[in-house]
A protein has these predicted regions:
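Loop-to-transmembrane helix entry
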Residues: 1, 80-90, 110-113, 186-203
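Hydrophobic core of transmembrane alpha-helices in multi-pass small-molecule transporters
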Residues: 33, 45-66, 70, 168
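Residue-level signature of mid-helix packing/kink "hotspots" within the transmembrane helices
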Residues: 2-7, 93-94, 201-209
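C-terminal ends and interior cores of transmembrane alpha-helices
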Residues: 24, 28-43
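Symmetry-related core transmembrane helices of the 12-TM Major Facilitator Superfamily/SLC fold
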Residues: 31, 96, 111-128
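Juxtamembrane intracellular "pre-TM" segments in multi-pass secondary transporters
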Residues: 129-165
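Helix-loop boundary and gating motifs at the non-cytosolic
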Residues: 1-3, 159-198
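Helix-to-loop junctions at the C-terminal end of transmembrane segments
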Residues: 5-18, 103-104, 207-218
Length: 218
């Protein structure tokens, strides 16, 4: 979901449909899988649960790139302003974790209803964002676009190659963080796991706000 969906959805947003409309549609579709998951879950139905989560992630993962695309399109100075805008996403992430723990929803279906409801509201909100037309609308889709040739060619630049390789390596432990940290913290006797996990997101805020200062040194 994290590797393939963003590429194909990005292709649609680049050539066919306004980015804010694609973004809104993805959040609404993603909310549906979360809202129906508790209705379908039950003993012996782990495959159904995993399918619903996969469908949600197929909708969610492309939104990370699409929100960045909209931001850089409309911010007057994206390099300096984007980290300040993006940090509010992390603050929202922390708020959600605190809410889940406050409601003691970690082990109940309520967490899925909260996720689905938030995704639904966010989807409708996206339609109020500034219009961001597809930059390549009307242009034919070429074979090199399907294999992301232009993106691969950027690997010739050493700085970009280092960035991509580093990002790839960082995402390996990050996947384990998402998948297993809650079980590990529960085994350690930590209660209110969702709230405890926000400590990691708090460090993200610090480094994100430092980014404009670091860019000045480049």
């Amino acid at each position: 979901a994290g590797m393939l969906a963003p590429f194909f959805i990005g292709l649609i947003a680049d050539r066919f449909i306004n980015t804010e409309k694609v973004l809104g549609g993805l959040f609404i579709l993603g909310s549906a899988s979360m809202l129906i998951l508790p209705q379908l879950a039950g003993p012996g139905k782990s495959s159904i649960v995993n399918t619903c989560i996969l469908l949600h992630m197929l909708c969610y993962m492309p939104t990370l790139a699409l929100t960045a695309s909209i931001s850089f399109k409309h911010l007057s100075d994206g390099v300096k302003q984007f980290p300040i805008v993006r940090v509010w996403g992390t603050i929202g992430w922390i708020a959600a974790g605190l809410l889940i723990s406050f409601l003691d929803a970690e082990k109940t279906a309520l967490q899925f209803y909260i996720a689905g409801g938030a995704s639904l509201l966010l989807g409708f909100f996206c339609f109020s964002l500034p219009k961001t037309p597809a930059p390549l609308k009307g242009e034919p889709v070429k074979f090199k676009d399907l294999i992301f040739w232009d993106a691969w060619s950027l690997m010739k630049k050493p700085s970009f190659a280092v960035f991509i390789i580093s990002s790839f390596l960082i995402c390996i432990p990050l996947a384990a963080y998402y998948a297993y940290l809650q079980n590990q913290m529960s085994a350690m006797g930590i209660t209110n796991v969702a709230a405890a996990k926000t400590l990691g997101q708090g460090s993200e805020i610090i480094f994100m706000l430092l980014m404009p200062l670091l860019f000045r040194k480049l």
